[in-house]
Amino acid sequence: MHGRLKVKTSEEQAEAKRLEREQKLKLYQSATQAVFQKRQAGELDESVLELTSQILGANPDFATLWNCRREVLQHLETEKSPEESAALVKAELGFLESCLRVNPKSYGTWHHRCWLLSRLPEPNWARELELCARFLEADERNFHCWDYRRFVAAQAAVAPAEELAFTDSLITRNFSNYSSWHYRSCLLPQLHPQPDSGPQGRLPENVLLKELELVQNAFFTDPNDQSAWFYHRWLLGRAEPHDVLCCVHVSREEACLSVCFSRPLTVGSRMGTLLLMVDEAPLSVEWRTPDGRNRPSHVWLCDLPAASLNDQLPQHTFRVIWTGSDSQKECVLLKDRPECWCRDSATDEQLFRCELSVEKSTVLQSELESCKELQELEPENKWCLLTIILLMRALDPLLYEKETLQYFSTLKAVDPMRAAYLDDLRSKFLLENSVLKMEYADVRVLHLAHKDLTVLCHLEQLLLVTHLDLSHNRLRALPPALAALRCLEVLQASDNALENVDGVANLPRLQELLLCNNRLQQSAAIQPLVSCPRLVLLNLQGNSLCQEEGIQERLAEMLPSVSSILT
């Protein structure tokens, strides 16, 4: 037995570790207590730096101790010479780097470094950029370090082109670098600003085509990595629509003027307000949303005085101006006409996608074919399938409608965990296509029956629709945005899964509402219909509430103006 190393048993090892932890805890607690006592006594000297170094060196995520260090450093600045202060800062930077090696994702350490560098008269920003490069080489997903690099680049006024080159080097080394792709999406709009475009606006076409080629190389190298696919989707995105008036509608009978915006806005806010001119004379009116709530909305209304609608003149001219962008629309109400409107002739490029040049269309068509080839090799790659769908939407949504639906079916089978999201996205695309077809046909009737819809969107585009058929879908609710349909007279929503009709409110022209075979269980669910003054026909057959005793009398009492209620 002599000369052989004694091996501790597991119990002895556990006991030794316990004693070691207890010893460390005692030291930790005593050092912390000493720091707090000195802080309370106002003893902001270098001994506090030494004590906090012992603790933060092992646990950099003690925010209160970083605050203590800042207080001490600020105090010592007033007592030491410039040379001594510089030495103190140099030592602090070295200590921070050692803390980052303990925990490269320490909030407190990176924040303290920002604070320290901000106080220096001439920081060495080049050294800080090199520090970031080292830590990102160790862990390219360290978003704390990415945040710090953006701070350094901003303080040092590093040109966006240099930072873009830095992302090039990281992406070239490893395509699976979401942070680099994201940083790239922030830098490119700065490098190539476009007129009338926001910070996430579109890129010049030559830049866009180059980026598409780069990202295609990435996802063909590793088809299962999502980073490049997300960046590709950003490239295919479109800029935020400008704040413009899409439509103005005047109803003589309701004595009401309705306007529709390209996106939800608040009238009367810092963004702008609406000015109304009637026969070239300004008219002061109160603007409101269809539901009466003062919040951003696509549609805004105002009541018109009788004088602006009288028949003594052959016509009345209504001009609405949005001060936020000087957008305006004008329509003329002729004598004996019940309504008038003005709306731009919309195309799919204007409504739902960007206009494509011949060159860009050629590139995207080539990408589509390449993705189809990749999908044959990787038939269960969900990112590839989704990108094929998005490319088809970007190229021609109506031409590829049938093929897009087939790819949706394949994608749902491949990615069943996201079936609900895919159903909603499919519904969105189908509704967009239906709106486009309605625009091209120049009609005010929209048929959306038997389309397996799960959600409704773009309802602001339907302000002029008089008949809407939503029957035989999978809708569980009708959204409040339905109030945008100011001209709607007939709504068919039978054979869905509606549990309430909260969205069917404040529709001034609604006359017929068909709700057969839904999931309406109580008469209280019908209460919102009280706000539809012209409703005369309500069909509730096939709903559970029809089994309630005395339901007919209860509904007649609730809706006295509805002459025909079918249960």
Curated annotation (Swiss-Prot):
GO terms for cellular component: cytoplasm; Rab-protein geranylgeranyltransferase complex. It comes from the Eukaryota. It catalyses: geranylgeranyl diphosphate + L-cysteinyl-[protein] = S-geranylgeranyl-L-cysteinyl-[protein] + diphosphate. The modification Phosphoserine is found at residue 98. Belongs to the protein prenyltransferase subunit alpha family. Its EC number is 2.5.1.60. Heterotrimer composed of RABGGTA, RABGGTB and CHM; within this trimer, RABGGTA and RABGGTB form the catalytic component B, while CHM (component A) mediates peptide substrate binding. The Rab GGTase dimer (RGGT) interacts with CHM (component A) prior to Rab protein binding; the association is stabilized by geranylgeranyl pyrophosphate (GGpp). The CHM:RGGT:Rab complex is destabilized by GGpp. Interacts with non-phosphorylated form of RAB8A; phosphorylation of RAB8A at 'Thr-72' disrupts this interaction. LRR repeats lie at residues 442-463, 464-486, 487-508, 509-530, 534-555. One of its GO terms (biological process) is endoplasmic reticulum to Golgi vesicle-mediated transport. The lineage of its organism: Eukaryota, Metazoa, Chordata, Craniata, Vertebrata. Catalyzes the transfer of a geranylgeranyl moiety from geranylgeranyl diphosphate to both cysteines of Rab proteins with the C-terminal sequence -XXCC, -XCXC and -CCXX, such as RAB1A, RAB3A, RAB5A and RAB7A. It holds the Pfam family RabGGT_insert. GO terms for molecular function: Rab geranylgeranyltransferase activity; small GTPase binding; zinc ion binding. Keywords: Leucine-rich repeat, Phosphoprotein, Prenyltransferase, Repeat, Transferase. This is Geranylgeranyl transferase type-2 subunit alpha.
